[in-house]
Amino acid sequence: MNTWKKELSFIFVLLLVAALTACGSTNEETNGEQSGAGTEVSEEEITIAQINWAENIAVTNMWKVILEDKGYDVTLSLLDMGVTMEALATSEIDLSLEIWLPVQDANYLETYEDTINFSESTWFDNAKVGLVVPTYLEEVNSVEDLNEHKELFDGEIIGFDSGAGTMEVTEQLIEDYNLEFELLPSSEPAMIAAIGQAIENEEPIVSPLWSPHSVFSNYDLKFLDDPQKTFGGVEKIHHASRLGFEEDHPEVSEWLKNWKMDDEEIGELIDYVESAEDPLDGAKEWIEENQELIGEWVK
């Protein structure tokens, strides 16, 4: 049973290698481009953290295109969430475009509220987080059902990046519900691959997941009820910047505050980025087709 689990570690390694080359412009690529252009640092350089999550890859590439069209030199630096927060706090990077509040990233807000500027503005207002299972598991509809079906899942919740706020909340959920389960970290691509493999074999799997996410277009999944509201209700997505960024780049800061997307817009952007051979090309195509929306942000 659960034959996909034997392949999970191998999938994780392959996807981690692929992520370093498939997530658009990275720090390594940009450094290579700059090495032949001298060592002078432009005041218009901006470094944005990129996390290997579908929506994060989409919006970071989107903003790279938008800002470079405006004359900025943008580097996307591939990091995990914990390193991103530390890098913002020490001003090693300028921006993180994905902070989920009030629940998922509350721990980061509490830890870094004096050393990072967490914007009150939001760019997505209808996000949801929880545990998901395939819809064919008709007997499992609530987190409270999991212990009863522990053997079905081998007592495992298949997770993603260990430093992510949602993973920390999932650990809290295990405690709140006294679940006899272990949370297994991997990466988002490895987790999605595991979900796909399980569904292909009509096997059980339970994982923490969030919406918006393109996986819901590919597989029939359902969120489990969370009576204790450990995952909270509706989440909103903010951005964060290093201290002093607003003073250094007031125009960009204003554009980010104007940034708003709905389910259809972010879903379409993710589709364009994931369908393109180069994520940056997908972002460019989407931007070309949504000039009116972009104009509302950068006015």
Regions found by a protein language model. Give the residues of each.
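C-terminal motif of bacterial Sec signal peptides marking the signal peptidase cleavage site
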Residues: 18-22
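Short, low-complexity, disordered segments immediately C-terminal to signal peptides
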Residues: 24-43
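Short, well-ordered beta-strand elements
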Residues: 40-55, 72-77, 154-158, 256
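Short helix-initiation/N-cap motifs at beta->coil->alpha
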Residues: 53-54, 75-87, 184-194
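Pocket-flanking alpha-helical
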Residues: 60, 80-114, 193-194, 214-219
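Ligand-binding pocket segment of bilobal, Venus flytrap-like solute-binding proteins
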Residues: 93-97, 162-229
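A conserved helix-loop-strand patch within extracytoplasmic ligand-binding domains
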Residues: 114-162
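A bilobed periplasmic-binding-protein/Venus flytrap-type ligand-binding module shared by bacterial periplasmic
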Residues: 128-138, 235-248
